């Protein structure tokens, strides 16, 4: 049907006086964004979602429906996929983008301001902790284990048969 390849052509025309020249901001060239052939998935994150009618509904050679049924079902599939996608994106895209932005901003903030300083602090303190742990081991644990070992080494068992 070709509906999945059609792109919406949206253009915004403004007079030069509509721009506020007093703000000191440089605006991007509108011609740069007027390209309707823009690739919205440059890293191919969702290449697995490019399904056609033949990928979902397939009739073997031995069982074919009427040609009109096949054509109408193909048209209905493409139209419903196109319309439902547009409908769902109108109502879900903006709220989900907002929530994803909040989530990623929160995770970035936690990573930058809490997790990485904590990790760096631990890595910075570890040599001191290692030195203290070695001293504690040499002063307390090693003599304790040595004395327990000597105590158990003097234990002997003798078996007698009576």
Swiss-Prot record:
It comes from Plecturocebus moloch (Dusky titi monkey). Residues 87-107 dip into the membrane without crossing it. The lineage of its organism: Eukaryota, Metazoa, Chordata, Craniata, Vertebrata. This is Caveolin-2. The gene is CAV2. Phosphorylated on serine and tyrosine residues. CAV1 promotes phosphorylation on Ser-23 which then targets the complex to the plasma membrane, lipid rafts and caveolae. Phosphorylation on Ser-36 appears to modulate mitosis in endothelial cells. Phosphorylation on both Tyr-19 and Tyr-27 is required for insulin-induced 'Ser-727' phosphorylation of STAT3 and its activation. Phosphorylation on Tyr-19 is required for insulin-induced phosphorylation of MAPK1 and DNA binding of STAT3. Tyrosine phosphorylation is induced by both EGF and insulin (By. similarity). One of its GO terms (biological process) is positive regulation of dopamine receptor signaling pathway. May act as a scaffolding protein within caveolar membranes. Interacts directly with G-protein alpha subunits and can functionally regulate their activity. Acts as an accessory protein in conjunction with CAV1 in targeting to lipid rafts and driving caveolae formation. The Ser-36 phosphorylated form has a role in modulating mitosis in endothelial cells. Positive regulator of cellular mitogenesis of the MAPK signaling pathway. Required for the insulin-stimulated nuclear translocation and activation of MAPK1 and STAT3, and the subsequent regulation of cell cycle progression. It comes from the Eukaryota. Residues 1-86, 108-162 are cytoplasmic. It is found in: Nucleus; Cytoplasm; Golgi apparatus membrane; Cell membrane. Pfam families: Caveolin. The modification Phosphoserine is found at residues 20, 23, 36. The keyword Phosphoprotein applies.
């Amino acid at each position: 049907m070709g509906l999945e390849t059609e792109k919406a052509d949206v253009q915004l025309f403004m007079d030069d006086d509509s721009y506020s020249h007093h703000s000191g901001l440089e605006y991007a060239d509108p011609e740069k964004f007027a390209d309707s052939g823009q690739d919205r998935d440059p890293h191919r994150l969702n290449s697995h979602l490019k399904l056609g009618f033949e990928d979902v509904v397939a009739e073997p050679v031995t069982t074919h429906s009427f040609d009109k049924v096949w054509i109408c079902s193909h048209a209905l599939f493409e139209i419903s996929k196109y319309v439902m996608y547009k409908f769902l994106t109108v109502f879900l895209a903006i709220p989900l983008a907002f929530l994803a932005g909040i989530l990623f901003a929160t995770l970035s903030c936690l990573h930058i301001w809490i997790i990485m300083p904590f990790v760096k602090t631990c890595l910075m303190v570890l040599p001191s902790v290692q030195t203290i742990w070695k001293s504690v081991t040499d002063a307390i644990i090693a003599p304790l284990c040595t004395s327990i070992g000597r105590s158990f080494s003097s234990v002997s068992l003798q078996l007698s048969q009576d």
